Amino acid sequence: GTTLLRDLLRLHPHLECPEETHFFRWPDPYASPRFMHPYTQNKFIKKQREMDGISEQEFIHLIETSNSRSELAEAYGNLFLKKQNNPHGRWFDKTPQNIYGILLISRLMPDSRFIHIHRNPLNVVASLLQGKVLSATGITDAISYWCEAMVIMNEYKRIAAYRVLEVSYEHLTSDPLGSMITILEFLEEDPDDYVLPDKFVHGEHNKYLDTLSEQQIKEVKQRCRPYYSMYGYE
């Protein structure tokens, strides 16, 4: 769902999004060896920077001149805007694992806003078990991806609900324009500047019906409580 939302947001002329930055993904202290390792050694992350048009030399300079995750993120985002020839635009990050760093993001980037896109856990689990984008080794960790994110988000909403907009993947795909108008208003971006091409979004296909057994479906529904019903999937 984050990729679709990213693609929809980037249709607005003021909004730009790099590939997933992962700057708030891991809990290790900023600039520590364990924090730095994936950014210097992970081929996938380095490839994403290449796709953003940011060279290794440029990234090293950003690291050397940043004293925190937020400084690095801001510097990276601003450089990316220049690479996109949109220096006065606004950048955002779609890294799904930002959920694990939401408290740090919230404190270090006080003007940030969060869009929580949620999807029927049955389809999430089915997708993770297929492993085309992100994979799970079994149904337990597949369910945990959904449940742990829900726990964190609902606890965060108790602190700063006004900074969060929750968007249903199912509603986004059934009424993309209406959903995007709501999202853009939340972000204080002008919906009049937004144009959605025809057939840009396809509806939810409920692939879990062809992927999960009856027992697995029952297990997902049971273990995803109470959020399964709270979010209208009952």
Language-model-detected regions and their locations in the chain:
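PAPS-dependent sulfation machinery
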Residues: 16-94, 98-99, 228
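Short, solvent-exposed loop/turn segments at secondary-structure junctions
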Residues: 22-24, 97-99, 120-123, 130-131, ...
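PAPS-dependent sulfotransferases, especially Golgi type II membrane carbohydrate sulfotransferases
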Residues: 30, 129-132, 136-137, 147-150, ...
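Surface-exposed cleft-lining segments at the edges of enzyme active sites
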Residues: 63, 86-91, 129-141
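Soluble or luminal CAZymes and related metallo-dependent hydrolases
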Residues: 68-75, 94-97, 141-149, 175, ...
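Conserved phosphate-donor/acceptor-positioning beta-strand/loop module used by diverse small-molecule
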Residues: 94-95, 104-129
